């Protein structure tokens, strides 16, 4: 079960809001629920007869970001959001010195999800101001052990 999401449209993501994605290669087994144009992914690990109590997934994110035209240059930060809260353990930060200059950010996190429970993940702008996002790309997959 690996799934890929992206967005070819540039978007302005307000502070404390999620990056929006379209389906590229969605999960065909119904384990990842996502609607086109949404920023929230609901993960539903399958319940099995095994003693497994949790599932671990590797979540990878990459995008180009910039301060919008007319904005004040300063640090840009994004984090994964787990069930609505920004996870401060993995934060991508870059500091453009001029507006509209593109910089790359990347996030990677191993997320543990209890079997039988749903967990929502997203990519959240935690900058404190609006940020332009170009070509966001998200992959959700089981880790290779």
Residue ranges and their predicted role:
Residues 1-145:
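Extracellular jelly-roll beta-sandwich "head" domains, especially the C-terminal globular C1q domain
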């Amino acid at each position: 079960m690996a799934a890929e999401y992206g967005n070819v449209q540039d978007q302005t993501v307000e502070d404390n809001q999620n990056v929006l994605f379209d389906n590229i290669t969605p999960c065909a087994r119904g384990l990842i629920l996502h609607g086109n144009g949404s920023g929230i992914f609901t993960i539903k690990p399958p319940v099995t007869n095994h003693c497994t109590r949790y599932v671990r997934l590797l979540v990878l994110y990459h995008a180009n970001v910039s301060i919008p035209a007319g904005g004040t240059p300063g640090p840009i930060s994004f984090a994964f959001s787990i069930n609505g809260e920004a996870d401060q353990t993995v934060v991508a930060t870059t500091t453009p010195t001029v507006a509209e200059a593109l910089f790359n950010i990347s996030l990677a996190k191993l997320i543990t999800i209890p079997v039988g429970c749903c967990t929502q993940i997203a990519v959240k702008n935690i900058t404190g101001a609006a940020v332009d996002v170009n070509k966001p790309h998200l992959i959700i997959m089981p880790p290779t052990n």
